[in-house]
Amino acid sequence: MSIRSLGYLRIEATDMAAWREYGLKVLGMVEGKGAPEGALYLRMDDFPARLVVVPGEHDRLLEAGWECANAEGLQEIRNRLDLEGTPYKEATAAELADRRVDEMIRFADPSGNCLEVFHGTALEHRRVVSPYGHRFVTGEQGMGHVVLSTRDDAEALHFYRDVLGFRLRDSMRLPPQMVGRPADGPPAWLRFFGCNPRHHSLAFLPMPTSSGIVHLMVEVEQADDVGLCLDRALRRKVPMSATLGRHVNDLMLSFYMKTPGGFDIEFGCEGRQVDDRDWIARESTAVSLWGHDFTVGARG
C-alpha cells in the first residue's frame, strides 16, 4: 500500500505550559525545533517531531500526518482521491518547510478530520535520549496509533480501506446506545486498520469528541518503562482513564491517561506485529485480556 505509517500528529492547545510539562516530564519525549512562535515540537526518534503542539483557542486535533515511501506512493494517493472525488490541496512552501518534507497534500476525511500525506522527511541525526532512559518503538511502525472520531462507521470504513488503502485488521461491535443510536438500531463498529507490521496504526470510533481524537498510543520497549511512566503520571496527579491491562487484539500492555487537551494517551509496550500474508481479520468480543478498567476515568 502507499501509506506506510503514522508520521506525526499536530494538535492545537490552550495550555502550552501544561503540555510542555506533560510531554517532557511525563511522556519523556525530547524537545525539538520549529518555526511557529510558541509551538512545542516533541521528538521520539530521528523525525524532526512526532507530536507538534500549537497554541490556540481550542484543544483539538489539527492534522494527522501519514507517510508514504516515495513520490510514487503519494501520487497513487492523489489518483485514488481523484477517483473518489475527494478534493485535496498541495502543501505550501511554508508548510513543507515546517513539516520538513519533500511533498505533501492535505485533505479531509468524510468526518472532517484533516489528514496530511507526505514523503521525503528530512531526518534529524542527533540521537534522541529520553531523560528517563526509555526508547520509543517507531521505525517502520511509525509514531504509534491514533483513534479518530467519525460520524459514520460505514462511511469511514469505505474511505480508509477502499480509498486510502488501509488494511482492516480487526473489528469490535459496540452497543448502538453507546453512540446515541436506539437500542434496537444497528451496532456501531470500532475498526482497526494497519499499514505496516504494527497491529493497527489507525482506528475510528463512531462517536463525536470535542477534540476529534479519542486517543493516541505511543509504545516503548520494556514493561518497566511503562511502569515508570505510570509512576511519573501518578506523582504529577495526571488523571487516569484506564488501569494497567493487556488488550486482546494487539496484545499491548498499557495504561491510559488524560492529556492536557482532554483526550487520552495510551502508553504501552509489547504490541503485536502482524504479517498480512497470513493475518486473518476477525471480530474481537472483549477489550482486554485483563485490566484496563475504564471506570477509573469516570470516577476521576
Swiss-Prot record:
Superkingdom of the organism of origin: Bacteria
Induction remark: Induced by KstR.
Residues engaged in binding substrate: H200, H215, D250, Y256
Residues reported in the UniProt entry to bind Fe cation: H145, H215, E266
VOC domain residues: 5-120, 142-270
Catalytic activity line of the entry: 3,4-dihydroxy-9,10-secoandrosta-1,3,5(10)-triene-9,17-dione + O2 = (1E,2Z)-3-hydroxy-5,9,17-trioxo-4,5:9,10-disecoandrosta-1(10),2-dien-4-oate + H(+)
Disruption phenotype: Cells lacking this gene completely fail to grow on cholesterol due the blockage of the catabolic pathway and develop a pink color consistent with the accumulation of toxic catechols. Mice intravenously infected with the mutant survive substantially longer than those infected with the wild-type.
Subunit structure, interactors included: Homodimer, but may form a homooctamer.
Other remarks on this protein: Cholesterol metabolism contributes to the survival of M.tuberculosis in the host by helping the bacterial multiplication during earlier stages of infection and to the dissemination of the pathogen in the host.
Chain's role: Catalyzes the meta-cleavage of 3,4-dihydroxy-9,10-seconandrost-1,3,5(10)-triene-9,17-dione (3,4-DHSA) to produce 4,5-9,10-diseco-3-hydroxy-5,9,17-trioxoandrosta-1(10),2-diene-4-oic acid (4,9-DSHA).
Recorded family membership: Belongs to the extradiol ring-cleavage dioxygenase family.
Protein name listed in UniProt: Iron-dependent extradiol dioxygenase
Organism the protein comes from: Mycobacterium tuberculosis (strain ATCC 25618 / H37Rv)
